Amino acid sequence: MTRLVKALVIAYQRFFSARRPYRVCRFEPTCSEYMLQAIDRYHSRGILMGLARILRCQPFARGGYDPLPDHFTLKRNQPK
Protein backbone atom coordinates (compact mmCIF):
# COMPACT_ATOMS: atom_id res chain seq x y z
CA MET A 1 0.00 0.00 0.00
CA THR A 2 2.76 2.45 0.89
CA ARG A 3 4.55 1.78 -2.40
CA LEU A 4 1.40 2.63 -4.35
CA VAL A 5 0.84 5.87 -2.44
CA LYS A 6 4.50 6.87 -2.85
CA ALA A 7 4.28 6.17 -6.59
CA LEU A 8 1.15 8.33 -6.85
CA VAL A 9 2.79 11.19 -4.93
CA ILE A 10 5.92 11.04 -7.09
CA ALA A 11 3.76 11.02 -10.24
CA TYR A 12 1.90 14.07 -8.92
CA GLN A 13 5.21 15.86 -8.26
CA ARG A 14 6.60 15.12 -11.71
CA PHE A 15 3.55 15.56 -13.91
CA PHE A 16 1.33 18.12 -12.18
CA SER A 17 3.19 20.09 -9.55
CA ALA A 18 6.31 20.66 -11.66
CA ARG A 19 4.25 22.19 -14.47
CA ARG A 20 2.78 24.98 -12.36
CA PRO A 21 4.42 28.38 -12.82
CA TYR A 22 4.01 29.17 -9.11
CA ARG A 23 4.17 27.34 -5.78
CA VAL A 24 0.78 26.23 -4.47
CA CYS A 25 1.55 24.69 -1.08
CA ARG A 26 1.62 27.07 1.90
CA PHE A 27 3.92 24.83 3.91
CA GLU A 28 7.63 24.02 3.90
CA PRO A 29 8.33 21.20 3.16
CA THR A 30 5.54 20.93 0.62
CA CYS A 31 2.65 18.58 1.34
CA SER A 32 3.90 16.02 -1.17
CA GLU A 33 7.44 16.08 0.30
CA TYR A 34 5.92 15.77 3.79
CA MET A 35 3.85 12.75 2.68
CA LEU A 36 6.94 10.98 1.28
CA GLN A 37 8.94 11.69 4.45
CA ALA A 38 6.07 10.51 6.65
CA ILE A 39 5.69 7.25 4.72
CA ASP A 40 9.44 6.61 4.91
CA ARG A 41 9.49 7.15 8.67
CA TYR A 42 6.07 5.88 9.83
CA HIS A 43 5.09 3.50 6.99
CA SER A 44 1.29 3.09 6.69
CA ARG A 45 0.63 5.55 9.55
CA GLY A 46 2.58 8.10 7.52
CA ILE A 47 -0.20 8.04 4.95
CA LEU A 48 -2.58 9.32 7.65
CA MET A 49 -0.10 12.03 8.61
CA GLY A 50 0.21 13.11 4.98
CA LEU A 51 -3.56 13.20 4.49
CA ALA A 52 -3.98 15.27 7.67
CA ARG A 53 -1.38 17.70 6.33
CA ILE A 54 -3.18 17.97 2.98
CA LEU A 55 -6.42 18.78 4.82
CA ARG A 56 -4.60 21.57 6.72
CA CYS A 57 -3.29 23.07 3.45
CA GLN A 58 -6.05 25.46 2.46
CA PRO A 59 -6.28 29.16 1.56
CA PHE A 60 -6.88 30.34 5.14
CA ALA A 61 -4.10 28.23 6.67
CA ARG A 62 -1.23 29.98 8.43
CA GLY A 63 1.34 27.94 6.49
CA GLY A 64 5.06 28.27 7.09
CA TYR A 65 7.68 25.82 8.26
CA ASP A 66 6.08 22.58 9.47
CA PRO A 67 8.63 19.73 9.50
CA LEU A 68 7.80 16.09 10.12
CA PRO A 69 7.55 15.54 13.90
CA ASP A 70 9.71 13.05 15.78
CA HIS A 71 6.64 11.13 16.93
CA PHE A 72 3.42 10.08 15.21
CA THR A 73 0.74 12.76 15.39
CA LEU A 74 -1.97 14.14 13.14
CA LYS A 75 -1.54 17.70 14.44
CA ARG A 76 0.68 20.49 13.20
CA ASN A 77 4.01 21.05 14.94
CA GLN A 78 3.71 23.88 17.43
CA PRO A 79 6.47 26.49 17.34
CA LYS A 80 8.65 26.56 20.46
Swiss-Prot record:
GO terms for cellular component: plasma membrane. It is found in: Cell membrane. SMART domains: Haemolytic. It holds the Pfam family YidD. It is a peripheral membrane protein. InterPro entries: Membr_insert_effic_factor_YidD. NCBIfam families: membrane protein insertion efficiency factor YidD (TIGR00278). Belongs to the UPF0161 family. This is Putative membrane protein insertion efficiency factor. It comes from Limosilactobacillus fermentum (strain NBRC 3956 / LMG 18251).
